[in-house]
């Protein structure tokens, strides 16, 4: 007679034997062997095809995985690959502006309001940059330009005795590089700009202005790679007849300024500085804007990589022009025109769907659809005061070479 305990032991042994047979069959299966051999993604594929496509904020978290990952993600080769993917990826926040207000720096992803108007989560909203604080309430702070995720701004002016200093900053990575005034004796900053030269793999900072006890305009360029200033040109009084050029508009690796001639204030012209060969050149304006029609002002802007120019006429109509082919000055084309709302100051950005970001005198930012007549406005930010904006893309590019 078999005892119950012996029957249980025999049944358990039989089950274990059957289970081992099935396990061996699974392991020895050619299909399972193939799947098992590809269970882990090659690390090269992870870095070249996966991590390069992630938003930079997510990428920062992956740097904490290990010292090896941190080192590889920080290499110039990976950063360039990530930058290329970021600019070409429509799902990564690209339509952003970096804002200087009287008290703080901000980042606004205005493109999210156009892509997902009913979504109240995600990347929407005004994000304050907490890593930088003003010591003078921003009175003497001015934006100089932005390129590939790096923002260039300066501080100085009459209140500081015209002592200037400049900064190249990645607000997402919280990396900053300080640049001193080339001579320390600028009397007044007339023009400035910031851009990237691909053939030299270098970022250049341009400043031009009057020096103390001199009527000449001096123009200097700073190389972020060599960390040196170079004097580019000295203009005699009246040779570069400008009242104030401000920050240059970067298109085709060339900085552009709309200039007011000193001796004839009503006459406007466009000046370009080629960052590649470091020479000044004249850019022809749209012929339609050179007629007798009275206008209140003409300004330049960047329209998704093309040079744009807009003009406000006395009747309140705004016309936007775009240079379709750079260098072919007869390719200026009228993009749109519509009646502008009171208090309009500047165009700040463009979405993929053709909507424009507008700035008003009180520091409000609105998204407008110029294709509708009258134009439809969507208020994004209200009453920031006296602000400046530059287009901005979130990248892992470092200002420290």
Question: Which residues does each PLM region occupy?
Answer:
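N-terminal entry/capping and adjacent linker segments that precede and initiate structured domains
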Residues: 1-401
């Amino acid at each position: 007679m078999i005892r119950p305990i012996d029957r249980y032991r025999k049944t358990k042994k039989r089950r274990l034997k059957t289970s081992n047979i099935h396990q061996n069959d699974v392991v020895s299966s050619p299909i399972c062997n193939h799947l098992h051999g590809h269970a882990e993604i090659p690390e090269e594929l992870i870095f070249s095809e996966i991590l390069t496509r992630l938003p930079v904020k997510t990428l920062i978290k992956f740097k904490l995985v290990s010292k090896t990952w941190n080192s590889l993600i920080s290499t110039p080769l990976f950063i360039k690959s990530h930058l290329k993917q970021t600019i070409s990826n429509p799902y990564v926040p690209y339509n952003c502006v970096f804002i200087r207000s009287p008290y703080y720096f901000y980042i606004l992803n205005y493109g999210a309001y156009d892509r997902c108007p009913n979504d109240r989560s995600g990347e929407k909203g005004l994000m304050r940059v907490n890593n930088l604080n003003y010591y003078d309430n921003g009175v003497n702070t001015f934006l100089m330009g932005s390129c590939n995720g790096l923002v260039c701004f300066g501080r100085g002016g009459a209140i500081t005795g015209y002592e200037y200093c400049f900064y190249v900053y990645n607000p997402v990575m919280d990396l900053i590089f300080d640049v001193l005034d080339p001579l320390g004796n600028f009397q007044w900053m007339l023009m400035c700009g910031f851009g990237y030269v691909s053939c030299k793999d270098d970022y250049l900072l341009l400043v031009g202005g009057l020096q103390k006890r001199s009527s000449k305009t001096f123009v200097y360029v700073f190389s972020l790679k060599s960390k040196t200033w170079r004097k580019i040109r000295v203009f005699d009084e009246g040779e570069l007849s400008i009242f104030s050029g401000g920050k240059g508009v970067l298109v085709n690796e060339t900085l552009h300024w709309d200039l007011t001639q000193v001796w004839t204030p009503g006459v406007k012209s466009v000046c370009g500085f080629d960052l590649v060969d470091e020479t000044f050149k004249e850019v022809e304006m749209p012929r339609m804007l050179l007629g007798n029609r009275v206008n209140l002002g003409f300004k330049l802007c960047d329209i998704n990589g093309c040079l744009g120019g807009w003009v406000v006429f006395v009747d309140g109509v705004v016309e936007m022009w775009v240079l379709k082919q750079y260098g072919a000055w007869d390719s200026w084309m009228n993009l749109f025109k519509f009646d502008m709302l009171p208090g309009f100051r500047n165009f700040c950005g463009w979405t993929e769907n053709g909507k424009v970001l507008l700035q008003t005198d009180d520091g409000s930012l609105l998204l407008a659809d110029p294709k509708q007549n009258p134009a439809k406005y969507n208020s994004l930010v209200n009453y920031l005061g006296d602000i400046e904006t530059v287009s901005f893309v979130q990248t892992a590019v470092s200002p420290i070479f």
